[in-house]
């Protein structure tokens, strides 16, 4: 049976134009006008008039908490949330219990991701055993087992020698090192950005140099080893300046920014509210502007949500005691479209480049990030014209820890398909 998506506004090859998309056997068979004439029988038609038809979004940074912390999220609920947000490929971080730090555990996670995920869930292997920055993993074995890349996300690799050896091993395999950059000796128990707002709230601050100092170290190591070094969730002006300089010197570096760091600064934190506690923290107004500018000038390559669900108890009370993290899969596209595209700061084409094309391209995902005949039919349909309210009751994630609940936005997901199969469809109310 074939599926025809009719009359949509298709994003392809950097432009948006009206076209039909014909899908057969999980693949895109044809793109063009009046394709209903191509298949006469057993054709399912989907009317996408006045809707955006885009390549499925790609998120290289999610936390699915499974195994070990399934009261926060599972592979299934996390992937449902991703589909709700228009994502068809996501990459799951290894801060799990047990940590996927052996070939056997990586293979098991890859199998579970395929079984339980409704979207394509790629698995990071850890850089060190137990995420402890000490003993390196079996890089060769973990690549063979299916590891997408290597990361100790949740904690930076604290010793330069360990990171250097990791980079050498990853480079030899043409694999990426994906780094949560944070020097633990510079944290001093902080819970939000160090600055005036932290002082006003009487809360301990996190210095921006805890991030940028480790980026500086790692960029020198990346230059020495030639590894593809990817920086997670950059958040400071100094960090992007370092990445910009490194790119000028032809160091093989890419980086991502999270939606919340584009949308909010520390001055937007209304009080001692754990829903505004994330790591890295919301930074200053100048930092936020630097992130926006760095997307526009190409220093920042992509947007990744850092989807980090927690239980209600873990995000209630005092910021000093609450867990770090914010959800993002279900709000990212709509919030960014509304706040940046509708206001003329970004174009729609740019937003899709950062949320789909670039992450797929930079990480060598040949079957993601573009709609072309012969490729997998991984796509999302968005309604850009109808305003709606982000409601807690609509979340498919177990986590509701986001300050964006209640926002009026545009860009609602109508339908998400993976390999030509519907994995999310909006219910009309």
UniProtKB/Swiss-Prot annotation:
Zinc in keyword set: yes
EC supergroup of this enzyme: hydrolase
A GO BP annotation: 'de novo' UMP biosynthetic process
Record CDD domains: DHOase_IIa (cd01317)
EC number(s) stated in the UniProt entry for this protein: 3.5.2.3
Catalytic activity reported: (S)-dihydroorotate + H2O = N-carbamoyl-L-aspartate + H(+)
Binding site for Zn(2+) 1: 61, 63, 153, 306
Keyword Transcription regulation: no
GO cellular component terms given for this protein: cytoplasm
An example Gene Ontology molecular-function term: allantoinase activity
Required co-factors: Zn(2+)
Domain of life: Bacteria
Bound cofactor: record note: Binds 2 Zn(2+) ions per subunit.
Database matches in InterPro entries: Amidohydro-rel, DHOase, DHOase/Allantoinase_Hydrolase, Dihydroorotase_CS, Metal-dep_hydrolase_composite, Metal_Hydrolase
Pathway as given in its UniProt record: Pyrimidine metabolism; UMP biosynthesis via de novo pathway; (S)-dihydroorotate from bicarbonate: step 3/3
Keyword set, alphabetical order: Hydrolase, Metal-binding, Pyrimidine biosynthesis, Zinc
Record-listed Zn(2+) 2 binding positions: 153, 180, 233
Binding site for substrate: 63-65, 95, 279, 310, 324-325
Active-site residue numbers: 306
Family designation: Belongs to the metallo-dependent hydrolases superfamily. DHOase family. Class I DHOase subfamily.
Function of the protein: Catalyzes the reversible cyclization of carbamoyl aspartate to dihydroorotate.
Protein name: Dihydroorotase
């Amino acid at each position: 049976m074939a599926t025809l998506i009719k009359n949509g506004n298709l994003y392809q090859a950097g432009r948006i134009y009206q076209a039909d998309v014909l899908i057969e056997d999980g693949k895109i068979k044809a793109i063009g006008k009046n394709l209903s004439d191509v298949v006469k029988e057993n054709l399912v038609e989907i009317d996408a008039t006045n809707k955006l038809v885009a390549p499925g979004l790609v998120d290289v940074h999610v936390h699915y908490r499974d195994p070990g912390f399934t009261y926060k999220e599972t592979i299934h609920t996390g992937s449902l949330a991703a589909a709700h947000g228009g994502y068809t490929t996501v990459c799951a971080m290894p801060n799990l219990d047990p940590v996927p730090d052996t070939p056997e555990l990586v293979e098991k996670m890859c199998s579970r991701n395929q079984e339980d995920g409704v979207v394509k869930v790629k698995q990071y292997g850890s850089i060190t055993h137990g995420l402890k920055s000490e003993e390196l993993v079996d890089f060769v074995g973990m690549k063979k087992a299916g590891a997408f890349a290597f990361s100790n996300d949740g904690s930076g690799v604290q010793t330069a020698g360990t990171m250097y050896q990791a980079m050498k091993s990853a480079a030899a395999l043409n694999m990426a090192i994906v780094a949560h950059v944070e020097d633990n000796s510079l944290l001093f128990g902080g819970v939000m950005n160090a600055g005036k707002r932290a002082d006003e709230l009487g809360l301990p601050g996190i210095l921006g140099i805890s991030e940028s100092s480790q980026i500086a170290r790692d960029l020198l190591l990346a230059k020495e080893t030639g590894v593809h070094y990817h920086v997670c969730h950059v958040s400071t002006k100094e960090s992007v300046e370092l990445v910009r300089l490194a790119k000028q010197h032809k160091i093989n570096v890419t980086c991502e920014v999270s939606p919340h760091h584009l949308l909010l600064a520390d001055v937007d934190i209304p009080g001692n509210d754990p829903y505004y506690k994330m790591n890295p923290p919301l930074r200053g107004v100048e930092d936020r502007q630097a992130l926006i500018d760095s997307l526009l000038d190409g220093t920042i390559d992509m947007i990744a949500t850092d989807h980090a669900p927690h239980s209600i108890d873990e995000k209630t009370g005092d910021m000093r005691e609450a867990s770090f993290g914010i959800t993002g899969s279900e709000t990212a596209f709509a919030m960014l479209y509304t706040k940046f595209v509708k206001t003329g700061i970004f174009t729609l084409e740019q937003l899709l480049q950062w949320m789909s094309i670039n992450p797929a391209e930079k990480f060598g995902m040949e079957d993601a990030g573009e709609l072309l005949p012969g490729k997998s039919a991984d796509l999302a349909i968005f309604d850009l014209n109808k305003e709606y309210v982000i409601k807690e009751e609509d979340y498919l994630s177990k986590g509701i820890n986001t300050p964006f609940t209640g926002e009026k936005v545009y860009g609602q997901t109508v339908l998400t398909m993976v390999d030509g199969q519907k994995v999310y469809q909006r219910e009309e109310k």
